[in-house]
Regions:
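Bacterial Sec-dependent N-terminal signal peptides
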Residues: 1-19
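Carbohydrate-interacting regions of secretory-pathway proteins
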Residues: 18-244
Length: 244
């Protein structure tokens, strides 16, 4: 008898559940309404912050706060070796980031000495720039790697002096009130349109020697590294994004 009652109750429950959604409109969501972002071929989207477009490094500065003094010419700018890193004046958290870069032709150079630079998100987490076209080096230090942490899924590098691009989703770490890590940073990277990193969970800030680790920090700038190579850049933009 108890079993019969249970079966009847279950049948009634399933019937009532089925009656909850009887029209297509019952499962339609109308709010919130996503904001409109205009998009264009080979141009930044309408809500992007333009970090470099044509002929000015006004959005950048040196680490000591002095004006960025890399060479600007014909809508591109090029590292002036020995002058030091530059970083954005604005600080960021989670971002979608686009950059185009070009390695010089360097005869006789190989490994890490061939077209080396890097993009440091929040001044700490490095996406490596390197001429990795027919250039052997440690694989967690080639183009598309999260330096000394994650090897790229593939090598999508083009020949030297051919323009390349990165499209990056960087999700910043969060910290507890006592400064300890709450959620670690993660990064997704497309190199020349090819997925090379997918939601990799960063082990900490980039280090050349030793293991990476997290130390408390707030939002930070995007830094471009002077590693002694005349890497050129153009069409740099960023979108601030919110994540649940």
């Amino acid at each position: 008898m108890r079993l019969l009652i249970l079966v009847i109750v279950l049948i009634d429950f399933c019937y009532l559940s089925a009656q909850e959604f009887t029209l297509p409109e019952d499962t339609e969501v109308w709010n919130p309404v996503p904001k409109i972002v205009d998009t264009f071929d080979n141009l930044a989207p309408s809500d992007a912050i333009i970090l470099f477009d044509k002929d000015s490094l006004n959005n950048w500065q040196k680490i000591n706060g002095n004006p960025a003094d890399w060479e600007v010419n014909s809508n591109i700018f090029t590292i002036k070796p020995g002058t030091g890193d530059i970083l954005t004046k604005q600080k960021f958290s989670n971002v979608q980031f686009h950059i185009e870069w070009r390695a010089p032709r360097l005869s006789g150079e190989s490994g890490q000495n061939r077209g080396n630079s890097g993009i440091f998100f929040q001044e700490r987490y490095e996406l490596q720039i390197l001429d990795s076209y027919n250039n052997k080096t440690y694989t967690n230090g080639q183009a598309g790697s999260i330096y000394k942490q994650f090897v790229p899924l593939v090598n999508a590098s083009r020949e030297p002096y051919v323009w390349q691009n990165y499209d990056v989703i960087f999700i910043a770490p969060t910290f507890n009130d006592n400064g300890s890590i709450n959620t670690r940073a993660n990064m997704t990277v497309f190199h020349n349109g090819i997925l090379v990193q997918y939601k990799v969970i960063l082990e900490g800030a980039t280090t050349y020697i030793g293991k990476p680790k997290y130390d408390f920090h707030n939002n930070g700038s995007i830094l471009l590294q002077d590693h002694g190579s005349k890497i050129s850049f153009r069409n740099i933009w960023v979108r601030e994004i919110e994540v649940p």
